Amino acid sequence: AIGGLSRSFPVEAFE
């Protein structure tokens, strides 16, 4: 949820 890559990846570890 928190991150721009969260849209492509199921991970919210990216900003």
Swiss-Prot record:
Anything else known: On the 2D-gel the determined pI of this unknown protein is: 4.9, its MW is: 31.6 kDa.
Organism encoding this protein: Zea mays
Protein name listed in UniProt: Unknown protein from spot 77 of 2D-PAGE of etiolated coleoptile
Superkingdom of the organism of origin: Eukaryota
